[in-house]
Design a protein with these regions (language model features):
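Conserved redox-cofactor binding core of oxidoreductases
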Residues: 1-28, 254, 258-263, 272
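Glycine-rich loop(s) and the adjacent beta-strand/alpha-helix scaffold that form part
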Residues: 17, 26, 30-36, 43-118, ...
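Generic recognition of flexible, low-complexity loop/linker segments
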Residues: 9-12, 27-30, 50-52, 93-94, ...
């Protein structure tokens, strides 16, 4: 389709190789580690239906269970050498959790277009790249890094009847026609990595006996400082474009809820890449510093969040890591 999905793109390509085996209803418990060889030797799974435990062996393991899933698996893969989680000699596994913060921006009405409507598939939205803290001219004194905008225009539907004046037959007749056009801009902003934003294993376990994750994460001073600018700049742009009755919004409440971490669904950073094994889990090729035949190429590898959707970056990192792993295998290094 026009919108990417693994089901329509990468999985069919993998199936055509004849070397893909999909094992459904398999819950990963941990990775199997050989202390004597310092290698992962496979994956330990639990059958979701029978609760039977099985192991799948492999020369090399790519762990890509999403940021929180991969981190949970690594933390639960304990051994004599790694009592605090596999490949965690640095102690930073689980730290520096990030997500994009958003739900702040502006929206207003577009006059004079009541006779215009779109046909066929929905039109695409717009994107405004980051424009803060790029150089001295755009530098802010109250925060570093910045945000971009995702936006679009639409006509209100019958749902506007919940707040529109009127009742009865007249209201119903009005709601049969498309409403006014409006346009909105929503900021997607960068979150800085901070060690205190972290996940650890809980004492509680799930139905498969696997420890749950305990998540401690909140926006820091830098994220909070940019949110007013996220809303005000959106309003300024819309008004300059001729949009009327512009109103700003920020759904983050004083108690920290409403726009809290996790709602962006772009979790990343908990098994970060880095040059120094003392401060990172993975090297520049997404290879674990501590365990050479283990690679992690999902969002947990990210060292910073930027302010853009990250999936294509994960795919690029995965392609590069696969190329490196193949070369390492051919050389007999892993």
């Amino acid at each position: 389709g026009s919108y990417f999905s693994s089901q329509s793109s990468t999985l069919p390509a993998a199936q055509k190789t004849g070397r893909l085996t999909i094992v459904p209803d398999s819950v990963v418990h941990s990775l199997v580690y050989d202390d004597a060889k310092n290698r992962v030797t496979g994956v330990r799974v639990i059958d979701a239906n029978t609760k039977e435990q099985r192991e799948y062996r492999a020369r090399i393991v790519f762990l890509n269970a999403s940021t929180l899933g991969s981190t949970r698996i690594l933390l639960n893969s304990k051994s004599a050498r790694f009592p605090n989680g596999l490949a965690n000699s640095s102690g930073v596994l689980g730290q520096n959790l990030m997500d994009h913060h958003f739900m702040a921006g502006a929206r207003g009405e577009i006059p004079g277009l009541k006779e215009h409507y779109y046909q066929g598939n929905r039109p695409n939205g717009i994107y405004i790249p980051r424009f803060r803290n790029l150089d001295e001219k755009t530098k802010r004194s109250d925060y570093i890094r910045g945000f971009g905008y995702q936006g679009g225009a639409s006509r209100s539907g019958w749902g506007r009847g919940g707040s529109a004046p009127g009742f009865g037959v007249q209201l119903k007749r009005r709601l049969r026609e498309p409403g006014d056009w409006s346009m909105g801009l929503t900021a997607f902003a960068e979150c800085l990595p901070r060690a205190e934003n972290a996940v650890t294993l809980s004492d509680e376990t799930d139905e498969y006996g696997i420890p749950k994750l305990r998540i401690n994460c909140a926006w820091g001073p830098n994220e909070l400082a940019m949110r007013k600018d996220m809303a005000d700049s959106a309003a300024e742009m819309l008004e300059a474009a001729g949009v009327k009755n512009v109103a700003t919004y920020d759904l983050l409440k004083p108690d920290g809820l409403g726009a809290e971490p996790g709602l962006g669904i772009h979790e990343m950073g908990t098994a970060r890449m880095g040059r120094d094994p003392k401060t990172s889990v993975l090297n520049a090729h997404n290879q674990a510093h501590d365990v050479p035949n283990l690679f992690v190429t999902d969002g947990s590898a990210m060292t910073s969040a930027s302010c853009v959707n990250p999936s294509i970056t994960y795919m690029a990192l995965t392609a590069r890591a696969c190329d490196y792993a193949v070369k390492q295998m051919k050389e007999g290094a892993i």
